[in-house]
Every structure is written in structure tokens, then in C-alpha cells.
Amino acid sequence: VTLFLALNWLAVGHAEELKPAAWSSAPEALQKCEELETARKWGEAIQLYEKALESFAGDQSLKYGLRRARIHHAVERRYGDLSFQGMLNDSGRTQLLNMFEDVYRSVQREYLESVSLTRFLAHGTESLYMALKNPVFIEKNFPDPAARQSRINSVRQTLISTYWNRPVSGVAETRQVLGSVCDLCRRELNLKDSAVLLEYVFGGCNALDEYSVLLTPDRYRELHGTIQGEMVGLGIEMKAEAGRGMHLLNVLLGSPAEEGGLRPDDYITDINSTDCRNLSTDDAAKLLRGSAGSAVRLSWISPDNQKHSGEFTRRRVDIHSITRRTMLDRQRGIGYIRMEGFQEDTVQELDAALRSLEAEGLQALVLDLRGNPGGLLDTAAAVAERFIGSGVVVSTRGRNQNQNQVYRVTGTYTRPYPLALIVDGDSASASEIIAGAVRDHNRGVIVGRPTYGKWSVQTIVRMPGEREMALRLTTAKFYSPDDRNYSGVGLQPDVLVPDATQTRTTFFRTRTPDEINADPDVAEAISALQQRLSRN
């Protein structure tokens, strides 16, 4: 399965909204970031480091701090994963040495660039070094951490003096080095082999780009469900806001959450009698997880400060790509479609929405891709065919020949009406494929803000063995029909709209057409279409 996923599966918290100009120097920015690290607010630290690097791109301390925060965040996320805990408890040395070898071989075979075994091993050593200072790792693996602190410090120093960037000539030598590290940690710390080797297995992937990662069984199942457009749970997207609780960014249509009265912009304050106003996103998510048919009781506050509570039963939730379709200007026949993902059934949903609007007199379309993180490559090409008459819509190029593909459309399903595309900084991957095709084919006007800038392809590589594990690897870059790649910069819109007041697009499914029209991005899109229609 080939994916375009804009974000790297970090459930980050809500960072303080600081503009780059808020820092007068890199050391000042570093201090603010390290304060968040000290408070173990890894997600917020990651966001703040990224923002600081926009101003001080070459600062090595900020770059290292970002890597450190990402490693700690990954360690704590793994240890909050039940499937990872199962691996920790029942995996032996030989099994995990084989897993390390399998992961590396898959990386060498599929990844966009060649990665040396020495580099892969070195990043595993760094992950173990960081983990030995992580409170969650220490609490899980050491019953009496205070009594062992001096030994922990000694082992960390040995990792630097003996194993840091240690060159290896092949798999056999690598297994010897890993065995030696296991022996050291068992002798000095009574740390079991699985805790050591799993840091190497998962941490080795830190040598890759930020979109490449080894997925635990639970995360692989979650990803598979997202691709298929289904999940088990309540059907919410949330971010922690310190002191306020879990801010609901989205509530899925037809989900237990929506049916029980939860709405975007509500704040969950209590989960099964646990106050979550100061929990991290990940910690709150652990409390919300459960099997289909199980119940959870929530308390929440709505935007009008009204308090609510209720019991919700977890079940399978279908994730829809098209979350709103409506006519915005019936006189001129201007319709609106909101698309939030590119999944297996997205094209069928889009076709149904288009047929419905066409029955109402559709003459021009506003396609809203704001906040759309992407999805499946084949789906993106099929969506593009609904609007591009013929020719290339996207091409991919990778290290392996099978990653070099050109996606063409024939115009069989093309709609000829004028198009306005709305994008923003969270429109990524597959959304950027559509934007690139619309731009290069001169098919419509693009409105909003620069796109995310993730122009790479990720492939899911299933790992051997009984456990349902997989690698998500960057295997290629993609290019617009005119052979442009906007990685790191994003595609600029034709009509730039300042992002002064962010309108939450998930609200649009319950707003009237007049309320949608009042959104600045939509208003600009309608204006462009009206001008186009008046010329016809």
C-alpha cells in the first residue's frame, strides 16, 4: 500500500503560538524549548523547536534538541502502547536480533536512500542512551531507579565511550555489538534484553526521514483502519490544552461522539472520573481506548461554557472523506465539497457528491482541501481525473525502478465546470497532488495559503513473523505534471488569503450556505468562480 501522510504520527500537544520574531536569539529560543522538555511536554517542545528553526535554521543546538525531543516522545509513546508492552514482555534476544536484521534489510531494499548499517546501529545506540534518562522508560524497567542511578549514568557513559558511532562491517559484527550492549545492561542494571534491543529496533529508524517509522502492531492496525475508512472508538480528533482539557478538533460524522452530543471546539475535562485537564494528548488517548462494545463516561464543556456529561459506547466508526456538500450560490450554480482524506472509498463518495450537486444545477465547484493530510496515491490520481481532462497528473521517482511511475488520466470521468481549490498549510501529500495537477493543467484557481510541502511517497512494508508489524518507509518523491517538486516549501496559491482568523472547517457540515460563504477563503473562491462564469 502506498501512502501520502503529511504528519509523522505524533500526537503532539498544543504549542504556544509564538511567531519567530518572539525570539531575539537562538539561545533564547533553546531555553524556551528546554523548559518544555523539562516539563516532559515533548509534543509541545517538538512544535516549538520546529518553529524556532524557521528563524535559526542552522543552529546545531536547536537541531539536536529537536531530535532529542522526538526520541523521548517516541519512547513514551511506545511504552504507552499495549502491543509494544507485549513485545517487551515476551520477546527474547535471538528473536529481537532477527527483527533488527529484518528491519534493516527492508530499509536497505525499499528506502529512498542507502543507509549504512553503522549509521542505523548508531541511531539505535542514541535511542537507548536517551531512554536511560527517560522517566517512563526508567519507571517501567527499574523497580528501584534511585538506587541504580549511578550505574545508569555509568552505562550511559560507556555507550558514548565504547559504542557511539561504532563502525560495523556486516550483520554478524552488528549482532556481536548488540549482544555486548545487552550483556553490559544486564550485568550493570539487570535490564532485560528486550528493553535494550527494542530501542535498537525502533531507534535505528531515527536514521531515516521524519515520515519513516516502524509501526507497532496496534499502530499498524490503526493505520490499516484509516486507509479503509474505519476505526473502533468514539470518533474524535483532539489536542491537549493545559488547564482546559482535550480540545476537540473534529467529531466524525455518525460516530458515538457525535450521536452523544460532542461537537468540535468542546473540551473534554474528565474521562471515567479522571481529571484530564492537564494530561497530555497521549495519556488521555490511553483512557479513551477500548474494545468495541465497551463504555466510557465523559464530562465536557461546550463553547458557551455549559457543562455536560454522558456515557459513550465504543464501536466501529466509518471515516468519511466527504464531510460536506452543498450549493453556495444557486443562482449561478456554485457548489461546495469538503474533502478530508484520500481513502479507499473516497472516489465513490466524491462521485456521489458530484451527482447530487449536478442534480441541483451545479455549474462551478469549490473543492475545499484545507487540513486534508493526504492518503492513497491511486485515490489521488482518480480524484484528479474527475477534474483533469487528459494527460499526466503526477509522477514518482525513487531509488528502485518499481518506484518510477507516471500516472495519466484519459478524461473518462472528467467534469468540465470551472474549479476553485482551497488549500492551507495542512493540505499535504495527496492534496498537493491535486493542487499541482490543477496548477500545471491550468484547470482552476487555487485559493488560500501555501500547502504543507510534503512531496514524498511512503510505502507500507509488512514485516515477517507472527506479529502484525510494518515499516512505513519513504520510497520515492512525487512531481507535478510539469515535473515540479515543492518539498519543504509547499505550493503557492493563486489567491493568497491571510490566515487572520482560522475558521474551523469541521463546522461547515452544520453551517448554512450563507455562513460558509462568509469564510474568507470560500468568499475568495466564489469571487473567482463568479468572474469566470460571467466571462462565459
Residue ranges and their predicted role:
Residues 470, 479-536:
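Conserved functional hotspot residues or short segments at active or partner-binding sites
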Residues 9-17:
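Signal peptide processing junction and immediate N-terminal pro/mature segment
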Residues 51-55, 102, 106-114, 123, ...:
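Structured segments of extracytoplasmic/periplasmic soluble domains
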Residues 16-212:
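Terminal targeting/pro-maturation regions of precursor/exported proteins
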Residues 34-39, 53, 187-193, 215-218, ...:
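Cleft-lining beta-strand/loop regions that shape enzyme active-site pockets
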Residues 1-8:
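Bacterial N-terminal signal peptides
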Residues 89, 93, 109-110, 130, ...:
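PDZ/PDZ-like domain segments forming the peptide/carboxylate-binding groove
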